[in-house]
Amino acid sequence: MSFPNAAKGIKRIYTAEILKLIGYICLILAAIVGVVALAAPGDEAYGAAETLSLGGFIGAIVLVVAFAILMITAFIMNLIGYINARNDNENFKTALVFLIVGIVFTGISVFVINNGLSSILYSLSTLSETLSTIFVIAGVMQIARQLGREDISKKGTTVLKLIITTEVISFILSFISTFLRGGTTEIVSTVLLLASLLVTFIKYIMYLSFLSKSKKMLQVIQ
């Protein structure tokens, strides 16, 4: 028994998720570089400070552009991967639907002026992306059981639980940080936001680990 379409699909999905991870790292670095540029010293060495500030902003812009390119490339890779894999398992068809719905929500949120509505649309986009991930894992687990690879299936169950848990924690932290503004609460808000990013990073690592093992499993049987 072989699943050539799923093998191609998972390989592309795995590559896409690595690109997304690199993209998020670029975004974080852009934020750090931007903050450093803003904090550049002033009066005593104005010329040097101005150069440092300008260089920092240029660096931040380059990193943001890299983030955008990586995310677009990752979406295309994911889209192709889902389309490939759906021919071997129905769960990937559902995952594809949520992937498209998520990008639609993201696209609309960019053009919405109302901050509240934009936040809701972004949250719906994040939820769609999470559901897409869940169905990818479910599809791989089903294939793993058909191949008698209970180890992969069990790992998938563990990753599913972790993803759901981290999403709940991330949502709560993001929700709390949204309503904390000004003074001391600004510091608390920043800490909570960083904690949310850390939780999301852990989720990505676990998901990548699962995809890596799944990719190897499918390559062996080809």
Give the predicted meaning of each segment.
Residues 23-71, 105-129, 167-203:
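Membrane-helix interface segments in multi-pass membrane proteins
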Residues 1-32, 70-110, 124-173, 199-222:
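Membrane-interface extramembranous regions at the lipid-water interface
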